A protein has these predicted regions:
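Nucleic-acid endonuclease domains
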Residues: 1-83, 87-200
Length: 200
């Protein structure tokens, strides 16, 4: 008898069903919204802010997927199939900053690729998307930091070809200003991505 989780046939997950937050857990007095609030309640936190940046880009281009796929080889996809990697940075953090503002840095531009059909990572780091978006939360005053105000964001866009030609893995805002186009306000992001996609 083949044990659960082994064997050549493998396992295929059932389709994910989007939740609306009102659902209640069995065995604990809590809703899915309670869980979301606990996990993502502070949109200044690094991981959460990065996912917010991905969400903003997804909304801008009309990503047809109903749910974020955390293990995918790109962050966002457009309706025409252009794949996008979103990198996020900010001057302010959710913790005390005795040394002042954080430097604007974007890392892991190239990363090992996950092959879900073979259940393995690629040996070498690769540029995995057609377009890169560098999202910067620009607020510098902690008292004025409004996590819901999208005008506090600016976006820079470049093609994957530029990343490959420059052979960079981590870049600062100086590199972005020199080699990417922008900064764009949120309203100009979709057009900028479409333009960069022609160059990848």
């Amino acid at each position: 008898m083949t044990e659960h989780g082994s064997g050549p046939a493998g396992l295929t997950p059932s389709a994910a069903v989007p939740l609306d937050g009102s659902e209640r857990f069995a065995g604990v007095d809590a809703t899915v919204a309670d869980f979301w609030r606990w996990v993502c309640g502070d949109l200044r936190e690094n991981t959460t802010r990065g996912m917010l940046a991905e969400f903003l880009v997804a909304k801008a281009v009309g990503d047809p997927r109903a749910l974020r796929i955390g293990w995918d080889n790109f962050d966002v996809v457009t309706p025409d199939g252009t794949t996008i990697e979103v990198k996020c940075s900010a001057f302010l953090q959710s913790w005390p900053q005795p040394q002042g503002h954080s430097a604007i840095v974007f890392g892991r531009l190239a990363a090992r690729e996950w092959d879900a059909t073979r259940n393995e990572w690629s040996v070498d780091a690769r540029i995995r998307a057609d377009v890169f978006v560098f999202a910067v939360q620009t607020q510098r005053d902690p008292a004025a930091y409004d996590v819901l105000d999208i005008s506090h964001w600016e976006f820079w866009v470049t093609s994957a070809r530029t990343i490959r030609e420059q052979a960079v893995k981590t870049v600062g805002i100086g590199w972005v200003r020199q080699h990417a186009t922008g900064p764009f306000p949120y309203g100009g992001l979709a057009h900028a991505i479409h333009t960069a996609a022609q160059l990848h």
